Amino acid sequence: MEKKKGELKSIFLPFLSTSHIIPLVDMARLFALHDVDVTIITTAHNATVFQKSIDLDASRGRPIRTHVVNFPAAQVGLPVGIEAFNVDTPREMTPRIYMGLSLLQQVFEKLFHDLQPDFIVTDMFHPWSVDAAAKLGIPRIMFHGASYLARSAAHSVEQYAPHLEAKFDTDKFVLPGLPDNLEMTRLQLPDWLRSPNQYTELMRTIKQSEKKSYGSLFNSFYDLESAYYEHYKSIMGTKSWGIGPVSLWANQDAQDKAARGYAKEEEEKEGWLKWLNSKAESSVLYVSFGSINKFPYSQLVEIARALEDSGHDFIWVVRKNDGGEGDNFLEEFEKRMKESNKGYLIWGWAPQLLILENPAIGGLVTHCGWNTVVESVNAGLPMATWPLFAEHFFNEKLVVDVLKIGVPVGAKEWRNWNEFGSEVVKREEIGNAIASLMSEEEEDGGMRKRAKELSVAAKSAIKVGGSSHNNMKELIRELKEIKLSKEAQETAPNP
């Protein structure tokens, strides 16, 4: 495709995981909304997560498309369709997905060359792409799927190693050098921060690639974590732009929200929507633990009992555990809740944006994945925090200690995303958090009020003159200047 004069042309390359794909695709759609030509490169199975959204945008005349590449499943010994790090991916297959991804690197680099973009935006887990961009003489911008606080906290642990001073795994220590006095325990830290492993080396490579990049993009906004936005730019010494909340900005009507992710059949949507619409305002608890988490049977029992005993209506998003007592238990529980009309179970993917904005929802129990935290802020909802893996425990600190819009369930132990872990949070702890979250007494000192105020700030950030809107316009302006400067050099006569 020929580039028009003055038109910016870009490539967006997500990682092979739904929680990374969705926000980066929303960012790509925002660039197209601002008249930047966008090509998203991914594999066939992963494209199904967002293709409906791209088709919608293209039908509106926006310059955006998907370029699908074949995942080398046969070469790495994987069944067709297993090409992402998701809840249904068997643990033993994850190393082969990494192998397949490494084989795709040459394919991606060739596309960078052939499509002739003016810049690329790639996920943090593509650190090699900064050198690929340098070869082409174009900027690479890194996408971070986490919060500014989480990245700042990880840097604090790497630089100061405060966990090594703790005598026991459960002893609390302060994370040095941060804008707030945040306490953690060793058990709450990701394993790669506790002691060096292969992932530690990968994260070092990612940090080095970020410092060589033109800058980084975050799904955040200034009023949400302003101190950490400034702190992170200071410690990294690089440019960074918060252009969130991207889900709010890129999905401003019901059609967009319904198309996002693994869209359900219409009759399935009507089921939960009809149930929700029959409930009183702010009376329903939403319970979801993200797109890649599974719980053991023992934990499912504790959650179910806590929800049933709470007396509150609830929607619970549950995952198939490949048969066994966990699935059987949930099916029986679902029948009982249908009979009492107290609970509604959604199996698999849930249209979270549509659910959270429903006036019946009064709060949510969340794993503190960053996408969900931001979407909860958009909706003005307080949270009961249940961190599990990745940077979740850092995000909990932002929600509970900094923003004061959440109450902790009491999870104490970090685990890998594809493991159950040894911790089982008891129904009493879950019940206490739910009671505090859904209380109408405001004993928390205004948690619900603060959540509503942040929702207003989120909406202001993406309006003309808002912090995220200004960041987007400034970044595009800089990228246009780089393009024009490059073109001037290429057309200048030789001395």
Curated annotation (Swiss-Prot):
Listed Pfam families: UDPGT
Entry keyword annotation includes Glycosyltransferase: yes
Binding site for UDP: S291, W349, A350, H367, N371, T372, E375
GO molecular function terms noted in the UniProt entry: soyasapogenol B glucuronide galactosyltransferase activity; UDP-glucosyltransferase activity
Enzyme Commission number(s): 2.4.1.272
CDD domains per the UniProt record, alphabetical: GT1_Gtf-like
Residues holding an anthocyanidin: T18, H20, A390
InterPro entries with a match to the protein in the record: UDP_glucos_trans, UDP_glycos_trans_CS
Membrane-crossing residue ranges in chain numbering: none
Active-site residues from the entry: H20 (proton acceptor), D123 (charge relay)
Catalytic function, reaction form: soyasapogenol B 3-O-beta-D-glucuronate + UDP-alpha-D-galactose = soyasaponin III + UDP + H(+)
PROSITE patterns: UDPGT
Keyword Transferase on entry: yes
Protein keywords: Glycosyltransferase, Transferase
Similarity comment: family membership: Belongs to the UDP-glycosyltransferase family.
Chain's role: Glycosyltransferase that transfers a galactosyl group from UDP-galactose to soyasapogenol B monoglucuronide in the biosynthetic pathway for soyasaponins.
Protein name per Swiss-Prot or TrEMBL: Soyasapogenol B glucuronide galactosyltransferase
Organism: Glycine max
Lineage: Eukaryota, Viridiplantae, Streptophyta, Embryophyta, Tracheophyta
Originating gene: GmSGT2
